[in-house]
């Protein structure tokens, strides 16, 4: 992993994580629960996903059904570190509303329609299917309580390529089963991985005939057609101009089928994109493929660091952002700039620089203003959700936030002169 193009305070953090070994688990356990209850996901403030999982016949929660991670630790994990619980804890159930399945059910955890979470969180028990394909089992994903879940196209195609599509059921009501078999997670963020977990992605990728699709020397994954990115990221036009000038094919992955996305990953020598879910697609890559990820925040995507190790990727990180205000990695907003680190990469590789009209001071000021306005609107919404303020309180908070942001912008401009 090349960290030469990271800000100095970031480089040390990345290097420490890169040096940490990610253990490869050879044996994965299973837990069997007779007359177990499947609990669909119920919203909980202190969980990434919520409450849900499996209860035993006496309605005690089965810890093996939790979904866990160590994603919040941007440093090597120790035995004393507490696991994050993405899905966990039971809840009271009404026996009169419980459905019953007189079958053995394989528990797969929770699923939603976020592609990134599907790849690294929701797929971790699918390996069990590959090891028991000759057995006539049903495989159950939990979905949100009372939700009529319909998988998005890439997830649906993933199941088809794996061969499990016809075996799946989605649990949106409390359901009691003759037996529930709970495979252990095949991968836990920042804790361990397994060959079994990787076999799932190898099986899916090998089910696509990549020879039917074009091959590329260099591809840049753009997010400018991604709806969420339009509301959280500013300045990608700098990268679009830079990479198009230097021979990269510009591709918007959300406009491709899963087969096409897999073919792009496996048929391209050098892939590049902004850090995020795009990099997680490298789970479909061949070992030792080369990728460049441009950072939009100081927050480290720990799952991506794991993927780099699992697939032995030739990864280069470049810092090219201005973080004027704190923001969560999944929230934003993010301001992408033509940083000194990106310029160093461009010069060291004899690349053409972006056009002046996308990296000028005038453009930077305009992007900064848009960034401030976006930050203000997004965080005002967060205040409304968290504190449930009245309209009058929100107007006062809006004025305070606006004043502080404007003062910060004025001070920043004075310091730059």
Language model features: what each stretch is:
Residues 1-414:
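The feature primarily captures lumenal catalytic ectodomains
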